[in-house]
A protein has these predicted regions:
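Aromatic (phenylalanine/tyrosine) cluster motif
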Residues: 1-2
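N-terminal auxiliary segments of SAM/dcSAM-dependent transferases
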Residues: 5-117
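SAM-dependent Rossmann-like transferase core, predominantly class I methyltransferases
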Residues: 82, 92-178
């Protein structure tokens, strides 16, 4: 809780919720394993009050996705890989992605150009909203109990990435999807 004084900008009253260049440089020097970076990312997300919810559900999942995807590894990579030592260039890439995520508050999906919807991967960037919607569950449940019969036509209008249309086409292969 912050008590603001009249005439004092909010930005001056709140604690710094960004990562300093010195801290990131120290991390690049000292953190050498995937596990180190995942732990550091979680601490940064929590310490800087980073909103989680554009494709991951908690700071650990967000950190795992950030580190592993930046390294071009699967999010479901074997746990043994967590002790792998990173090259300086890999550490720099993670630090830069983390800086953008924390300091610029860029959603991770935009930084990775990847979001999942209904279990399907989609390329995303700043031109579309990050796909996340309870509609994915409705599609998986085949819109039951609202639709009793297979739909013959499905229209996805102005939803951005087209993820709803693609997920519907996969779930209802006999329907015409526009």
């Amino acid at each position: 809780f912050f008590l603001l004084k009249p005439g004092v900008p909010v930005s001056d009253a709140l604690p710094a919720l960004t990562l300093s260049a010195d801290l990131l440089a120290e991390a690049e020097r000292e953190l050498v394993t995937i596990r180190d970076w995942m732990r550091f990312c979680v601490s940064c997300f929590r310490g800087c009050d980073v909103h989680i919810g554009h494709g991951t559900s908690d700071p650990f999942a967000e950190a795992s996705a950030l580190v592993l995807q930046t390294l071009n590894l699967e999010w479901s990579a074997d746990e043994e890989i967590l002790s792998a030592r990173l090259l300086p260039s890999e550490r720099a890439a993670i630090a830069e992605t983390l800086r953008k995520r924390v300091n610029d508050r860029t959603p991770l999906a935009y930084l990775l150009n990847l979001a999942y919807f209904n279990g399907l991967p989609f390329y995303v960037d700043e031109r579309v909203l990050v796909p996340r919607s309870p509609i994915a569950e409705l599609i998986q449940d085949r819109f039951l109990p609202w639709l009793k019969d297979e739909p013959q036509r499905i229209l996805d209008l102005c939803t951005g990435s087209g993820c709803i249309a693609i997920a519907c086409a996969k779930e209802f292969p006999d329907a015409v999807v526009d």
